[in-house]
Amino acid sequence: MAIQSKYTNTQVEALISELLAVLAKHQAPTDLSLMVLGNCVTHLLDKKVPGESRQKVAEQFAKALTQSVK
């Protein structure tokens, strides 16, 4: 069963495009890009996710990321 998102493909693709444009503007190599994006994820988890939920959300994110590259 497909996962339904509350966000449209247009919203998601627009953000992806802008983020990738910033990385390209700075000519960031892949390892730096991954490090920066990982730090952004950590920042969002720390600032936007309640402490009691943080570990579970991080695990779900890691699982989704792992499944997306299979």
UniProtKB/Swiss-Prot annotation:
InterPro entries: UPF0352 (IPR009857), YejL_sf (IPR023202). Disulfide bonds: none annotated. Coiled coil: none annotated. Belongs to the UPF0352 family. This is UPF0352 protein Sfri_2492.
